Curated annotation (Swiss-Prot):
Annotated membrane topology: Single-pass membrane protein
Subunit field text: PSII is composed of 1 copy each of membrane proteins PsbA, PsbB, PsbC, PsbD, PsbE, PsbF, PsbH, PsbI, PsbJ, PsbK, PsbL, PsbM, PsbT, PsbX, PsbY, PsbZ, Psb30/Ycf12, peripheral proteins PsbO, CyanoQ (PsbQ), PsbU, PsbV and a large number of cofactors. It forms dimeric complexes.
Protein name: Photosystem II reaction center protein Y
Annotated Pfam families: PsbY
InterPro entries: PSII_PsbY
Transmembrane segments: 5-23
Keywords: Membrane, Photosynthesis, Photosystem II, Thylakoid, Transmembrane, Transmembrane helix
One Gene Ontology molecular-function label: manganese ion binding
Top-level taxon: Bacteria
A biological-process GO annotation: photosynthesis
Gene, per the UniProt record: psbY
Source taxonomy: Bacteria, Bacillati, Cyanobacteriota, Cyanophyceae, Synechococcales
Length: 40
């Protein structure tokens, strides 16, 4: 692994990971709302 490649890739991977985490959390919240509505 080239150090420059790591320096370029790490912020991109962090950004993708953070976006994926936020999207996943939002999706879980929506699913929980749907489950609550279907039970009520």
């Amino acid at each position: 692994m080239d150090l420059r490649l790591v320096l370029v890739a790490s912020p991109i991977l962090l950004a993708l990971g953070w976006a994926g985490f936020n999207i996943g959390r939002a999706a879980v919240g929506q699913l929980q709302l749907m489950i609550k509505r279907s039970r009520a």
